[in-house]
Each structure stands twice: as structure tokens, then as C-alpha cells.
Amino acid sequence: MPSINDTHFYPPFFLLLGIPGLDTLHIWISFPFCIVYLIAIVGNMTILFVIKTEHSLHQPMFYFLAMLSMIDLGLSTSTIPKMLGIFWFNLQEISFGGCLLQMFFIHMFTGMETVLLVVMAYDRFVAICNPLQYTMILTNKTISILASVVVGRNLVLVTPFVFLILRLPFCGHNIVPHTYCEHRGLAGLACAPIKINIIYGLMVISYIIVDVILIASSYVLILRAVFRLPSQDVRLKAFNTCGSHVCVMLCFYTPAFFSFMTHRFGQNIPHYIHILLANLYVVVPPALNPVIYGVRTKQIREQIVKIFVQKE
């Protein structure tokens, strides 16, 4: 295989153009993205701090929430700082290795979040359908195994993306009309057939579809259990415990769904719309998740208020 310094096979760097078609608006677009990114950083760091310092929150649900915050921090930080560098300082250049690394982390964190949402749905299923056995089922050992699955499955699925890109010649093509590196965009620059890349990408998407089916199945069982509860107050309490997770799922899958649909079937939609949707997908859910849990989860809300009151 040619070396990574062979500019005919691998370009020494890629140029990320940002959002072609909205070049003159880059500086204005950057400010809302910067604000949302800061909200994501502060919100998720706050969630992690509260869960770490408050012993009463050392429970399965909050361990999974801490994992969600770490994933959201990773997903947003792997994309937005580079985007802001492009918009503010015209730092379009990214090394070939750096581009592959960014691609790996974007797909890794995205995949981890889909698996974690399945795990969180299972957590709510056990909490509502088997409340008396909750602590017996979700032991520390079980939580460790589930966390390993969240990381391990996506490590296995995402690593081949790197080698699928490394096998392709680029013939000097290095202009990426995007704000970050992702598998489909890089493969599209190659001057060789990418059928294997496409097939593998569809296979990975099929895993995500299975995740969605598992989540939906969990909530069908949860709803059946909730409607069998004896009183309306108990049913409302059960719905409330699932509300945060449902909101998080909607925040994650809704922009992903629209991004996928416009990419697959929106050939007449301007390219900058595709890029804007792709960028919203990596920053809006990480910003909204801590807000949702901070507002809807009583234990989190009380501890945040307690911390700020004590500081005052």
C-alpha cells in the first residue's frame, strides 16, 4: 500500500470549505453555534459534577446519564471547535490523519449514543415493569457490562471506516464541501469505486435501525405496564420518569432523521441546507440533553439549586 505521504494516493491535507453558498454569512452563523456549544459544555459538565459529588445520585439511571453527558461532550467537541476555526480564522486545512481521526470520533460518539439510548430504555423498562428487582437486575457488574457494550460495539463497527478510507486513492482531490470530515464525504472524493464503502455504511445504518426498533419495543412494553397500574397518580409518576428519556430520544433522532431524508431524497434542496442540518445534529442534542434532564429530573434539579444556593 502506498505511504500516507504519497500525495497521489493520499492528499497531505484536506480543505474544509465550511458551508459553501453561505460563505459571506459564516461569521454570523458561527455565533449561534458557539452559544449552543457553550451551553452543551457547561450543561454536561454540570451534570457530571452533580452526579459525581452527590452520593444519592449514584444509581443506574444517573450513571447512564453521566455516560450520555460524556458522549455529548465528545460529539460536540470533535466538530464545533474546528467549525468555529473555519468561520472565524479561515482555518480550513486539516491533515489527512487529523481528518480520519475526526471522522472516527464523530461516528464513534454518534454510534455510542444510539446504543446508550437503548440501554437507557432498558433501564426505564426494568424500573417500571420490575421495580422490586431493579437494584438486583441493574447491579454495578451489569452496568459495567452494558457500558462495555456501548463502547465495544461501536469500536468494532466504526474502526473499519478508517481502513475503508485508507484503501482508496484520492488522485489529489482534497476539497471537502463541509465543516467536518465524515465517511461518506471522504469516500466521495476518491477516484476509485466506493461500492464496498456504501455497502458497509448501509450495514452500520441497519444496526441503528435495530436500536430504534429495540427502543420502540421497550416503550410498547412500558406503556402496557403503565396502563395496568392501579391509580392515575401512579401512572402519571411512571410517565414522568420516562419523559426525560423520550425527549432526549426525540432530540437525537429527529434532526438525524431529517438530515438523512434530505441527504437521500432531497436532491433539489440546496447543499448548504444539508450541511446546516448535519451541524445541528452534532450540537443541538448535546446542548438540550442536560437542559431536559435538569428541568425534568427532580433529583438533578434539586442538587443544582442546592449547589448554587450554597455558593451564594
From Swiss-Prot:
Its annotated compartments are: Cell membrane
Cellular component GO terms held in the UniProt record: plasma membrane
Claim: Zinc-finger is one of the keywords in the record: no
Query: Per its UniProt entry, which superkingdom is the organism in?
Result: Eukaryota
Q: How does it sit in the membrane?
A: Multi-pass membrane protein
- Tell me where it mainly resides: membrane
List the Cytoplasmic topological domains: 49-56, 123-141, 219-238, 296-312
Tell me which UniProt keywords the record has, alphabetically.
Answer: Cell membrane, Disulfide bond, G-protein coupled receptor, Glycoprotein, Membrane, Olfaction, Receptor, Sensory transduction, Transducer, Transmembrane, Transmembrane helix
Q: Which InterPro entries match?
A: GPCR_Rhodpsn, GPCR_Rhodpsn_7TM, Olfact_rcpt, OR51/52/56-like
Query: Per the UniProt record, which residue ranges are transmembrane?
Result: 28-48, 57-77, 102-122, 142-162, 199-218, 239-259, 275-295
> Got any disulfides in this one, which pairs?
99-191
Query: GO terms for molecular function, please?
Result: G protein-coupled receptor activity; olfactory receptor activity
Calcium as a keyword of this entry, yes or no, is no
Query: Which sites carry carbohydrate?
Result: 5
- The chain's Extracellular topological domains, given as residue ranges, are 1-27, 78-101, 163-198, 260-274
State the family it belongs to. Answer: Belongs to the G-protein coupled receptor 1 family.
General function of this protein: Odorant receptor.
Please give the name of this protein. Olfactory receptor 52E4
Q: Which organism is it from?
A: Homo sapiens (Human)
Point out the gene that encodes the protein. Answer: OR52E4
